[in-house]
Regions:
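Residue-level preference for beta-strand/loop junctions
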Residues: 2, 47-49
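Short, surface-exposed ligand-recognition loops at beta-strand->loop->(often short) alpha-helix junctions
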Residues: 9-20
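Long, low-complexity, Ser/Thr/Gly/Pro-rich intrinsically disordered segments that act as flexible linkers
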Residues: 94-102
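Active-site-flanking beta-strand signature of metal-NTP-handling nucleotidyl enzymes
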Residues: 3-8
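An amphipathic, aromatic/His-enriched active-site/gating alpha helix that lines ligand/cofactor pockets
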Residues: 20-38, 56-95
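Short hydrophobic/aromatic beta-strand micro-patches
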Residues: 9, 54-56
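Absolute protein N-terminus
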Residues: 1-2, 103
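A short beta-turn/loop motif at secondary-structure boundaries
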Residues: 41-47, 87
Length: 103
């Protein structure tokens, strides 16, 4: 099992809009059977205006398939695209971390 952590560093004043997008995405992911996603904001972090989303996947192959939208209906794919519209305007940059869950 792998833990995928998406770390986004938002532009000043844009955190709430990105949190709202992330929470909507988490809800859609859970509704479509892709599992639960946690969305967190910084309390004390490396940088201000940080959002972290994390979720678990069974393998890198499963993650790659999920990122490609494999197994999703065109309707669901369009919902994801609509949710993430304009997110580049909210974020300076981001990174992804992948961890193997040991226990």
């Amino acid at each position: 099992m792998l833990l995928i952590r998406e770390i986004m560093y938002c532009k000043p004043g844009k955190v709430r809009a990105m949190v709202d997008k992330s929470l909507a995405m988490a809800k859609l992911s859970e509704e479509t059977g892709m599992g639960k996603m946690r969305v967190m904001t910084d309390f004390c972090a490396e940088r201000y205006w940080t959002i972290v989303s994390e979720f678990e996947v069974p393998s890198m192959q499963a993650f790659e398939e999920m990122m490609k939208g494999e197994g999703q209906s065109p309707e669901i794919t369009k919902k994801y695209e609509k949710l993430m519209e304009g997110y580049h305007d909210l974020v300076d940059y981001g990174r992804r971390e992948v961890y193997k869950i040991e226990g």
